[in-house]
């Protein structure tokens, strides 16, 4: 598999990086260009942190009955700690409150696309835990390998794309492009 990715996928990812280099108008991409996709700036969410959560509620309500119930439970039980505040620890992750069989999401919304990534990626992890928490086989919910866990979170990122304008307005397609390029760049690294 690694040889196949090296032979076919790495050249594809290299072409994608070259197009990004040209779009940015730089001579070469360096490590500090890794998170930059557009010369005029990467897309940022159009709403407040509370509006981002409410857009997430709308998206998950329309996505499926199961995701609606999941997200409403997360909101109603206050299982998001995502608003920035003084002296709050950095980072973003999903964990569990196993005594209650519920997921919990911690992050620091800061007005970047990462805020929306919490609503898609971390909620992908959280939804997986939500649907499997009562499964008696611990490997199905608590002891996932990283590769397995990332299937749920990265898939949810793509499932969310039809609703991305809720978060980015007219910059929705810029976000889609940035997200796809980021996902493509991850394949050689993640393999």
Task: Describe every region a protein language model picked out.
Residues 1-191:
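Cation-handling catalytic/transport regions enriched in His/Asp/Glu
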């Amino acid at each position: 598999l690694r040889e196949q990715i090296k032979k076919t996928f790495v050249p594809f990812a290299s072409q994608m990086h070259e197009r990004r280099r040209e779009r940015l108008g730089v001579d070469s991409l360096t490590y500090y260009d890794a998170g930059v996709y557009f010369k005029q700036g990467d897309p940022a969410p159009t709403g407040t942190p509370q509006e981002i959560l409410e857009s997430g509620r709308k998206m998950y309500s329309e996505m499926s009955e199961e995701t609606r119930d999941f997200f409403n439970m997360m909101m109603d039980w206050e299982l998001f700690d995502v608003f920035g505040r003084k002296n709050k620890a950095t980072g973003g992750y999903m964990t569990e409150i196993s005594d209650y069989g519920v997921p919990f999401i911690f992050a620091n919304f800061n007005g970047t696309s990462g805020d929306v990534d919490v609503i898609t990626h971390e909620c992908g992890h959280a939804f997986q835990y939500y649907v499997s928490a009562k499964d008696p086989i611990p490997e199905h919910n608590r002891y996932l390998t990283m590769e397995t866990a990332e299937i749920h979170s990265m898939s949810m990122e793509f499932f969310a794309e039809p609703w991305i304008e809720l978060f980015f307005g007219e910059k929705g397609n810029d976000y889609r492009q940035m997200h796809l390029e980021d996902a493509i760049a991850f394949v050689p690294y993640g393999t």
